[in-house]
Regions:
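Transmembrane beta-barrel strands of outer-membrane/channel proteins
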Residues: 40-43, 62-70, 116-122, 169-175, ...
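Outer membrane beta-barrel transmembrane domains
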Residues: 38, 75, 82-83, 226-329
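Residues on the lipid-exposed face of transmembrane beta-strands in outer-membrane beta-barrel proteins
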Residues: 53, 64, 98-104, 152-158, ...
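Surface-exposed strand-loop-strand hairpins of Gram-negative outer-membrane beta-barrel proteins
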Residues: 35-41, 70-95, 131-143, 185-186
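Long, hydrophobic/aromatic-enriched structural stretches that serve as scaffold segments
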Residues: 86-153, 160
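Cleavable N-terminal export/targeting peptides
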Residues: 1-42, 329
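Short loop/turn motifs that connect adjacent beta-strands in outer-membrane beta-barrel proteins
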Residues: 35-36, 51-59, 71-73, 105-114, ...
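Residues that define the transmembrane beta-barrel architecture of outer-membrane proteins
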Residues: 58, 90-98, 112, 144-151, ...
Length: 329
């Protein structure tokens, strides 16, 4: 039986995991990659597969994303967190994000379509770390929950090259809407703006069921006005290779997800006391998906686990993602 990909995965449905970005990374108001607090707005691995593609036809979509992260960094690596210098950082977080995607009816050219998205993240975060001068550090803990940094995507363009291949062009804006306090280990927001252009290349064979997707993005960060800390520019590459096959009237996909993250410019500002603090990391793990119909409309779900390795100047840990997307029309 030849697998047939529903329109929700050929480019007519999609949402981005940016909310997970806000849901997990934003909530790590100081704990995860490099940059201030050891984390940026973008969560590596958040855009990596066809479920993160852009709509090619008129549609309205909603997606629920649930992300769990558990990471730590050793006591030999100091992290700048909300005006503090911390070592031995442990962070556990859960983020729930709701993303709305609207693709209007008008076309911008043959094979080209436009959409826009907005994401509301809610996060729970627990952070513990040793804070203070060397030899006098005190173990501190902080827990917080609330609205994270909202993600707006005013520009999301899809180029339908052929039935099997699409290219996405998008610009995301991370707004500092989450809670932030200087001197608090856990914050639901980053307290600065980020602009993130991304290009995604998605191949999905309508006859062979093979998926090969790659997303390349760059994050440009503004200065945190409360700490005078400007996080450096980051480049991230995320990819998925999967095989999809018919099952129970739908499509099942099994494959692997990988990402590479590299900070390409150093941190700056009066608050960047640890220096330029560049970071990098590599992640790899399995991914499974299912596409079916509910109420006559496409329902897409994806579950994946990503394990981090080869990590420098950021937390190292594991992420578990669950994404559920529903196409209303």
């Amino acid at each position: 039986m030849t697998p047939h990909l529903p329109t929700s995965l050929t480019g007519s449905t999609s949402v981005r995991l940016a909310f997970a970005t806000a849901a997990v990374l934003s909530m790590l108001g100081g704990t995860a990659e490099a940059e201030e607090g050891g984390t940026g707005h973008y969560l590596p691995g958040s855009m990596a597969s066809s479920i993160d593609s852009a709509p090619a036809k008129e549609s309205f979509l909603m997606r629920l994303n649930v992300v769990n992260y558990d990471g730590s960094i050793g006591k030999n690596q100091p992290l700048p967190i909300a005006g503090l210098t911390a070592v031995g950082v442990d962070a556990k977080s859960t983020g729930v994000g709701l993303t709305a995607v609207w693709r209007p009816s008008f076309e911008i050219g043959e094979g080209w379509s436009y959409a826009l998205t907005a994401t509301l993240p809610y996060v729970w975060l627990d952070v513990s770390a040793d804070v203070g001068a060397q030899g006098l550090a005190v173990r501190r803990s902080s827990s917080v929950n609330g609205l994270g940094d909202i993600v707006l995507q005013p520009l999301l363009i899809n180029q339908n090259v052929n039935p099997d291949f699409n290219i996405n062009y998008r610009v995301s804006l991370y707004a500092p809407t989450g809670s932030y306090e200087v001197g608090r280990l856990a914050n639901t927001g980053k307290n600065f703006w980020t602009v993130e252009p991304t290009v995604g290349f998605m191949y999905f064979g309508q006859k062979n069921g093979i998926e090969a997707s790659t997303f390349v993005g760059v994050d440009f960060n503004r200065t945190n006005p409360d700490t005078d800390y400007k996080s450096g520019t980051q480049v991230h590459v995320d990819a998925t290779l999967a095989q999809h096959f018919p099952w129970q009237g739908g499509l099942v996909g099994l494959g692997i997800n990988a990402y590479y993250y590299q900070q390409v410019t150093g941190d700056s500002g009066a608050g960047a006391t640890p220096g330029d603090f560049k970071a990098k990391t590599l992640g790899l793990g399995p991914v499974a998906s299912f596409v079916g119909k509910v109420g006559g409309h496409d329902l897409v779900s994806e579950l994946k686990w990503v394990h981090e390795s080869s990590t420098t100047n950021r937390l190292k840990g594991d992420l578990i993602w669950l994404k559920v997307l529903y196409k209303f029309y």
